[in-house]
Amino acid sequence: MLTIALSKGRILDDTLPLLAAAGIEPTENPDKSRKLIIPTTQDDVRLLIVRATDVPTYVEHGAADLGVAGKDVLMEYGGQGLYEPLDLQIAKCKLMTAGKVGAPEPKGRLRVATKFVNVAKRYYAEQGRQVDIIKLYGSMELAPLVGLADKIIDVVDTGNTLRANGLEPQELIATISSRLIVNKASMKMQHGRIQALIETLRGAVEARHQG
């Protein structure tokens, strides 16, 4: 049995056509089904529907053989028990710092609000900057407006939400897209099968990119 961990939303919607190219299609619509384990048209392949931030955990610990996760999630997770063999080139966005429009660069210790705590620590450590990192789970844009933080680190797509709240994107930390990840033990135990799937998906990604 091959188990593939996916999260609902943009990543799921963009991944399903790629899996379909490999002959793997869910027997129920994941967006409408309440089931978290969904069979597919291949009897020995199933999908696990989990939170986006949990996909690497399921794969690293072997509860899923493969998964699809955003590079932002993988950068924050930092797990060692994963291979990342393929950039699926879907769900593209940018991980950036942002602050109030026209605000001067703060002197001294910087306050940064983000859900990407590990990414933020690494980023500012590389710059040699002293920071206080404030963990938030959502509505990052609010933090600079009410004096909770000087800057935020968040995923930026169009930037419209930032602009609507008087903020502007500033420094690019990473360009983000979704990646196929594979459990290291699964890769050894089912190497031929997983490698064949990787190559099929690679072909589907290239065809989609060229199309």
From Swiss-Prot:
It is found in: Cytoplasm. Its main location: cytoplasm. Its EC number is 2.4.2.17. PROSITE patterns: ATP_P_PHORIBOSYLTR (PS01316). The keyword Cell wall biogenesis/degradation does not apply. The keyword Cytoplasm applies. It is an enzyme of class 2 (transferase). GO terms for molecular function: ATP binding; ATP phosphoribosyltransferase activity. This is ATP phosphoribosyltransferase. It comes from Ectopseudomonas mendocina (strain ymp). The gene is hisG.
